[in-house]
A protein has these predicted regions:
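Glycine- and acidic-residue-biased ligand/ion/polar-headgroup-sensing regions
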Residues: 77, 88-99, 104
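Conserved short histidine dyad/triad with adjacent acidic residue
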Residues: 54-58, 70-85
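A short hydrophobic beta-strand segment most commonly corresponding to one strand
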Residues: 67-70, 91-93, 117, 132-150
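A short, N-terminal "cap"/entry segment at the start of jelly-roll beta-barrel domains
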Residues: 1-66, 152-183
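Short acidic-glycine-tyrosine-enriched beta hairpin
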Residues: 105-121
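Short beta-strand His + acidic residue motifs that chelate non-heme Fe in jelly-roll/DSBH
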Residues: 81-84, 101-102, 118, 124-131, ...
């Protein structure tokens, strides 16, 4: 008799691992209170590219929060991100532009004002379907996932290394007075 797959099994499970470590609430509160309370977005630069750029305001490595990872994504006209999957959930608030996501092979269209939700363990990719840039503010629970030692992230298709034809010469809007894309 073959063993039942853990992937499709409905067997009862406990999904919490024991979390151990030296921890002083007093010391942790003092450390958190010593961290900056304002992140100057204008002092941060976009990285990655040439089709998808990221500006990280709060990252797990900063230690500024225990539960949040917040970054801004800007997609060049016709641009796309890497295809990847990760354990942590993510919410993309679409600031401007229009595009779509592919989540586990299913397409979801979005435009400014929408929120795109990426569920845990979903293989996904983000696409800008327009000839203008698109921008999204991204909120993730990545630090909490890392704390619980549940982090898993895998790239399926890497980021493009060449710009799209319509995105040649594109640079993210870093220091514009009006961060909304003019019509």
């Amino acid at each position: 008799m073959a063993r039942e797959s853990h992937f499709s099994s409905k067997k009862a499970r406990v999904f919490v691992r024991a979390i151990r470590g030296d921890y002083s609430l007093k010391e942790e509160l003092a450390r958190l209170r010593s961290m900056p309370r304002i992140v100057k977005g204008r002092e941060l630069l976009f990285n990655d590219g040439p089709q998808a750029f990221s500006k990280h305001f709060i990252e797990p490595a900063d230690g500024m929060t225990q539960t949040l990872h917040i970054h801004l994504e800007e997609y060049a006209p016709g641009g796309r991100t890497q295809k990847h999957g990760h354990v942590n959930e993510a919410a993309f608030y679409i600031l401007d532009g229009e595009g779509y996501e592919i989540h586990d092979g299913i397409r979801y269209d979005w435009k400014a004002g929408d929120v795109a939700i990426v569920h845990m363990n979903c293989v996904h990719q983000h696409f800008n379907a327009a000839t203008k840039p698109a921008r999204a503010l991204v909120l993730k629970s990545k630090p909490m996932i890392m704390f619980m030692n549940l982090l898993f992230q895998k790239t399926v298709i890497p980021r493009p290394t060449e710009p799209t034809p319509e995105g040649k010469g594109f640079a993210p809007r870093h220091l514009e007075e009006n961060l909304n894309h003019p019509d």
